[in-house]
Amino acid sequence: MAIVLGIDPGSRVTGYGVIRQQGRQLTYLGSGCIRTVVDDMPTRLKLIYAGVTEIITQFQPDFFAIEQVFMAKNPDSALKLGQARGAAIVAAVNLNLPVSEYAARQVKQTVVGTGAAEKSQVQHMVRSLLKLPANPQADAADALAIAITHCHLSQNTLRLGNDQMTLSRGRIR
């Protein structure tokens, strides 16, 4: 059994989702958003760090999964996203959580079946996979999808002694 915290980072809204994995069964534990309503970037980063720390303390996850930075058309947006990711990652590392990173296309491919999925498709599949009564809000759904991706991909990882091997298309890499 493992508890996984997924994070969808953002400088204004950071989504989080927490699930429990027991074998192939996934159970929803919680989700939501950390909203930073101030304009001052250092204060936003402090709020993200504090929010993620609080979530980790509340749910006691075993694993921390976060979306990788993608290259946006606006370099300023990419830098702010990177800073938000950094604040969340530092919170996890300070509490000794192992950090895994996943590309947005990889998350969509894992959860929906296509890397070009729309946000509404991700929300629908997260609702279906976790048997939720309604679609979660978009940022929380993305965070839950990141946690689901971590669970799915960790099932395809074999640990042999100190070596780690990953199954890819039926082959060990």
From Swiss-Prot:
InterPro entries: RNaseH-like_sf, RNaseH_sf, X-over_junc_endoDNase_Mg_BS, X-over_junc_endoDNase_RuvC. Binds 2 Mg(2+) ion per subunit. GO terms for cellular component: cytoplasm; Holliday junction resolvase complex. The gene is ruvC. PROSITE patterns: RUVC. It is an enzyme of class 3 (hydrolase). The active site is at 8, 67, 139. The RuvA-RuvB-RuvC complex processes Holliday junction (HJ) DNA during genetic recombination and DNA repair. Endonuclease that resolves HJ intermediates. Cleaves cruciform DNA by making single-stranded nicks across the HJ at symmetrical positions within the homologous arms, yielding a 5'-phosphate and a 3'-hydroxyl group; requires a central core of homology in the junction. The consensus cleavage sequence is 5'-(A/T)TT(C/G)-3'. Cleavage occurs on the 3'-side of the TT dinucleotide at the point of strand exchange. Its cofactor is Mg(2+). Keywords: Cytoplasm, DNA damage, DNA recombination, DNA repair, DNA-binding, Endonuclease, Hydrolase, Magnesium, Metal-binding, Nuclease. The keyword Disulfide bond does not apply. One of its GO terms (biological process) is DNA repair. Its main location: cytoplasm. Mg(2+) 2 binds at residue 67. It comes from Yersinia pestis. The keyword Hydrolase applies. This is Crossover junction endodeoxyribonuclease RuvC. It is found in: Cytoplasm. Coiled coil: none annotated. Belongs to the RuvC family. Disulfide bonds: none annotated. GO terms for molecular function: crossover junction DNA endonuclease activity; DNA binding; magnesium ion binding. Mg(2+) 1 binds at residues 8, 139. Homodimer which binds Holliday junction (HJ) DNA. The HJ becomes 2-fold symmetrical on binding to RuvC with unstacked arms; it has a different conformation from HJ DNA in complex with RuvA. In the full resolvosome a probable DNA-RuvA(4)-RuvB(12)-RuvC(2) complex forms which resolves the HJ.
